[in-house]
Amino acid sequence: MALYCIGDIQGCDAALQRLLDTVDFSPSRDTVYLLGDLVNRGPQSAEVLRRCARGGDSLRALLGNHDLHLLAAAHGARKPSRRDTLAGVLQAPDRDALLDWLKRQPLAREHRLAGERLLMVHAGVLPSWTADATLEHAAEVQARLQGDALPEFLQAMYGNAPDRWSDELSGMDRWRAIVNALTRLRFCTPDGRMDFDSSEAADAAPDGLVPWFDAPGRRTRGTLVAFGHWSTLGWMNRPDLLALDTGCVWGGCLSAVRFGATLAEREHISVRCEQAQAPG
């Protein structure tokens, strides 16, 4: 059995197929975690969702900002933009089944290997959150996605406030902060105020901001966190950090990491991608 994480696919199903072929993926033997942004900007979003839905327990996805945007568009809470490539899902004959599968996916996952813990999110983890708290907060939002008031939740999900976490937050303010941290976060202030204006590489952080994973006192240090979302960051491999968005949809690569007997044993595997859209 092999364990993998794969970064942002964004509707590039042909690249995903090549990557799975490259690693000789076997659904009966292997487990693959997909770190969100399964859809949008690439040409094959519906195909990606179908592959994931039929993959069962061997393909385990979590939600990114583009996946939530698809749900919002499908429920009339947001209009697709000119750069969105969601029509293949929204007009598909199996649309309802694909969307039902998507809304049942979590915003964070964990995996245990040889007594070690792997925490997976799409974008980031707030410095004040432990791994347990991250999973608990993600479960709060997942419950909303499966509730009767889903269209209202998706309508109210958008926005940048509040930009600072407090355990006292409640209702939509609380859930929006959770969504933003797990699916949009790149930079924050050293004391944890979230920034949503900057998407530069980590070494070009604007004044007063740090990458979320370098915030002082981050409580998930010591737990391996794998994430995507940040294509200008690219591949990053630290003892407690794995960044896996290598810009497939922009003509970069689709990246996977294969773990060995422990989480410290890692192999980076990637395939080149055709450019589906230009950055910007």
Curated annotation (Swiss-Prot):
Alphabetized Pfam families for the sequence: Metallophos
GO terms for MF: bis(5'-nucleosyl)-tetraphosphatase (symmetrical) activity
UniProt catalytic activity: P(1),P(4)-bis(5'-adenosyl) tetraphosphate + H2O = 2 ADP + 2 H(+)
Keywords recorded for this protein, A-Z: Hydrolase
Gene3D superfamilies given in the database record: 3.60.21.10
EC number: 3.6.1.41
Family to which the UniProt record says this protein belongs: Belongs to the Ap4A hydrolase family.
Main function: Hydrolyzes diadenosine 5',5'''-P1,P4-tetraphosphate to yield ADP.
NCBIfam families, A to Z: apaH (TIGR00668), PRK00166.1 (NF001204)
PANTHER family with a match to the protein in the record: CYTOCHROME C5 (PTHR40942:SF4), PTHR40942
Full protein name: Bis(5'-nucleosyl)-tetraphosphatase, symmetrical
Species in which this protein is naturally found: Paracidovorax citrulli (strain AAC00-1) (Acidovorax citrulli)
Lineage of source species: Bacteria, Pseudomonadati, Pseudomonadota, Betaproteobacteria, Burkholderiales
